[in-house]
Regions:
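Glycine- and other small-residue-rich loops at beta-strand/loop junctions that grip anionic moieties
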Residues: 58-62, 128, 155, 177-183, ...
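Divalent metal-coordination and catalytic microenvironments
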Residues: 7, 57, 88, 125, ...
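Metal-coordinating catalytic core of metallo-dependent amide/deamination hydrolases
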Residues: 2-128
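Short, acidic/turn-prone active-site loops that include or flank metal/cofactor-
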Residues: 19-22, 150-154, 179-181
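Catalytic core of soluble alpha/beta enzymes
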Residues: 91-123, 128-144, 154-167, 182-185, ...
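His/Asp/Glu-enriched, well-ordered alpha-helical/loop segment
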Residues: 115-122, 163-252
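C-terminal cap of metal-dependent C-N hydrolases
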Residues: 236-290
Length: 290
């Protein structure tokens, strides 16, 4: 409630949800299948489509939800089909083996979510670092999306996300920070780390592609590209104004860059919180740097 209230106060476009987790975590963090269903249902009724707010059914990930809780998540999705679904998928190899041991009757990690009706449009899966070929195909077939979280994947040593494969399979991708599991909430630094992840795989991430992932690509992965993601007339005015020369090093590199793509590359590799000059939410100024 507190998160939704804070977002509502500034009329933010936000998708959020209560984490569902009834096993394999500290006792003080656990709920139950029944309590998670009822608490989520109350939040959906109170906040989903309240102003610009939207709700995501959020099992933390398959290992921390019992089959009974997964069934409750499925029930919520069936009762509220216009909600979103968000969870983790194939982040690291030990996690994948763990899922297979907990759900031996399922054909892999993604199949757990799929059999509980938790794939499809408006279903966003974080990480997806170690997907099997059949899982890539299923994400594509169901029109599910991926949140690419480079700072988290690098910090935890999870592996390297294969963006080229996602494009080949026509799977939508947006940028993510994995909340606090990465090393920054700043999108410029997230793009900087994404560049390194892809460079290690021989894939050169251009500045245009990077900023697409952080804007319209993210909007498309959320199914909100009719509302946000660029400056087309009629869209909601959520944007930041950035200063490309916020530090002496940025100034030096910027002054020696000729093309727009080079200037954007400087911003995405050297920029950070200091680059954010103003933030607008639905056309209203909500932050201005001193």
């Amino acid at each position: 409630d507190a998160l939704f209230e804070a977002a509502s106060h500034i009329n933010m476009r936000m998708i959020a949800g209560k984490v569902m987790m009834d096993r394999n975590a500290p006792d003080y963090l656990l709920d139950t299948a029944e309590s998670s269903y009822h608490q989520s249902k109350e939040l959906i009724e109170r906040w989903h489509k309240n102003g610009r707010l939207l709700y995501a059914i959020t099992p933390r990930f398959a290992p921390t939800s019992s089959p009974e809780q997964m069934a409750m998540a499925q029930r919520l999705k069936e009762e509220y089909p216009d909600t979103w679904v968000h969870t983790h998928l194939c982040e690291n190899k030990d996690e994948i083996a763990w899922v297979k041991s907990l759900y031996p009757d399922h054909d892999g990690y993604l199949d757990v979510y799929h059999q509980y009706g938790l794939t499809g449009k408006n279903c966003v899966f974080a990480h997806c670092v170690h997907l099997e070929e059949k899982e890539w195909d299923r994400l594509s077939e169901t029109k599910s999306s991926i949140a690419f979280c480079p700072t988290s994947n690098l910090y935890l040593g999870s592996g390297l996300f294969n963006l080229k494969k996602a494009w080949q399979k026509k799977v939508k991708v947006g940028m993510g920070t994995d909340i606090g599991a990465g090393t920054t909430f700043n999108m410029l630094q997230t793009l900087n780390e994404a560049y390194k992840v892809l460079q290690l795989q021989g894939y050169r991430l251009s500045a245009y592609e990077a900023f697409y992932l952080a804007t319209l690509g993210g909007a498309k992965s959320l199914g909100l590209d009719d509302l946000i993601g660029n400056f087309l007339p009629g869209k909601e005015a959520d944007f930041v104004v950035m200063e490309p020369t916020a530090t002496p090093l940025q100034q030096l590199r910027y002054d020696n860059s000729v093309s727009l793509v080079d200037k954007l590359f400087v911003m995405m590799t050297l920029g950070d919180d200091r680059s954010i000059y103003r933030t607008y939410v639905d056309g209203r100024l909500v932050y201005e740097r001193n």
